[in-house]
Amino acid sequence: MLGKALGLMKKPKKTVDQSTDAGGESKAPLGDISKMLNASGRIGLQMLQKMAAVYDKVEFGRFVQQPVLVGASIQAGSLATQNRHAKEELNKTVIFEVDAAEAASSSSESLKHAIYPLVKNEYASGRFHLFPIGRVEGNDMIMPDYAISKQHATIEIRRGDYLIRDGGSTNGTFINGKRLDKKPVQIRDKDIVAFARYEFTFLFPESLYEMLRGS
């Protein structure tokens, strides 16, 4: 009581959410990444860049939680034209034909902004350790392209490892150029993972942080 009267009460301990940057300015709490994903499971590149500029690698990794798939390139080619009614085409995957005359793949600025953390949306259902990928709703990573199958592939988180298996897709799932079957294959940091014509780089939070910081 005497301490209260004299204004000698202990100052509250500073929590992680009340941390400060090098300049002494307070930083906003990092928040929950699952609440920052859009309906397709993506998170904004600019948001991540700002966070990487303010927070250290440990704090950033705590926020991201899991590895991410970062858009890299689109393979040159075209979707095969098929004589089907429009309603049928909406429900079926179209075969992707590689264009041998074009470069193997081309960089896409819009795809580079496609970053999918292996984290379920706050409203998502299903088992926590399974991360389904496909063209339609119900997947954690949604790619609305006819080259992508409805249930294209699944990534499984198993005791700190990340395993991917193809779901019997029309245009295939690839790791570093090798087509997969339904047998699970481990993905490692900086592997190139492709779904049909779309290529992504698989990055652990530490590698994502370094990429965003330009290291």
Please give the residue ranges for each predicted region.
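Intrinsically disordered, low-complexity acidic Ser/Thr-rich regulatory segments
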Residues: M1-M143, E206-S215
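Residue-level signature for short turns and capping positions that connect secondary-structure elements
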Residues: I74, G138, I148, G160, ...
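Exposed loop/turn and edge beta-strand positions of beta-sandwich/beta-sheet ligand-binding modules
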Residues: R127, R158, D181
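Short hydrophobic/aromatic patches on the structural cores and recognition surfaces of FHA
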Residues: I133, Q151-E156, G160-I175, K190-I192, ...
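A structural connector/turn signal
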Residues: G138, M143, K150, L180-K182, ...
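Surface-exposed loop and edge beta-strand positions of immunoglobulin-like domains
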Residues: P144-Y146, R165
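C-terminal boundary/linker segments immediately following FHA domains
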Residues: F174-S215
